[in-house]
């Protein structure tokens, strides 16, 4: 009986873990959002445009399947794999 109960507990834990999804910040002032399936990387990039010197960089945050490539107009780029790590 104990073996059956232990087996059920293990199966339940494994099944719950398979359904886990990442949560990331979508904007600097937002609450965390659940990422779509397959997008388990949080990112945050600060990008400069023509108005960067007067108002600062444009911040973009969210969920991605792969980390974006760093570009010359990025001030910074962060990719991470833990919940809400892109603050």
Swiss-Prot record:
Q: Which CDD domains match?
A: TFP_snake_toxin
Localization recorded for this chain is:
Secreted
Which ranges of the sequence are coiled-coil? none
- State the signal peptide span: 1-21
For whether the record's keyword set contains DNA repair, the answer is no
Q: Which domain of life is it from?
A: Eukaryota
Q: Which Pfam families match?
A: Toxin_cobra-type (PF21947)
Tissue specificity, per the record, is: Expressed by the venom gland.
**Among its keywords, does the record have Metal-binding?**
no
Recorded GO molecular functions are: acetylcholine receptor inhibitor activity; ion channel regulator activity; toxin activity
Q: Kindly state which keywords UniProt assigns to this record, in alphabetical order.
A: Acetylcholine receptor inhibiting toxin, Disulfide bond, Ion channel impairing toxin, Neurotoxin, Postsynaptic neurotoxin, Secreted, Signal, Toxin
Query: Which GO cellular component terms, listed alphabetically, does the Swiss-Prot or TrEMBL entry include?
Result: extracellular region
InterPro entries per the UniProt record, alphabetical: Snake_3FTx, Snake_toxin-like_sf, Snake_toxin_con_site, Toxin_cobra-type
Disulphide-bridged cysteine pairs:
24-42, 35-63, 48-52, 67-79, 80-85
Q: How does it assemble?
A: Homodimer and heterodimer with kappa 2-bungarotoxin; non-covalently-linked.
Its annotated function is as follows: Postsynaptic neurotoxin that binds and inhibits neuronal nicotinic acetylcholine receptors (nAChR) with high affinity (IC(50)<100 nM). Is a selective, and slowly reversible antagonist of alpha-3/CHRNA3-containing and some alpha-4/CHRNA4-containing AChRs.
Q: Which family does it belong to?
A: Belongs to the three-finger toxin family. Long-chain subfamily. Kappa-neurotoxin sub-subfamily.
Q: What is this protein called?
A: Kappa-3-bungarotoxin
Organism whose genome encodes this protein: Bungarus multicinctus (Many-banded krait)
């Amino acid at each position: 009986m104990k073996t059956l109960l232990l087996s059920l507990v293990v199966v339940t834990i494994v099944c719950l873990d398979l359904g886990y999804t990442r949560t990331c910040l979508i904007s600097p002032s937002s609450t965390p959002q659940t990422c779509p399936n397959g997008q388990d990387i949080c990112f945050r990039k600060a990008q400069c445009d023509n108005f960067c010197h007067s108002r600062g960089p444009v911040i973009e945050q969210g969920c991605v399947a792969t980390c974006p490539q760093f570009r010359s107009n990025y001030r910074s780029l962060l990719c991470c794999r833990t919940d809400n790590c892109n603050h």
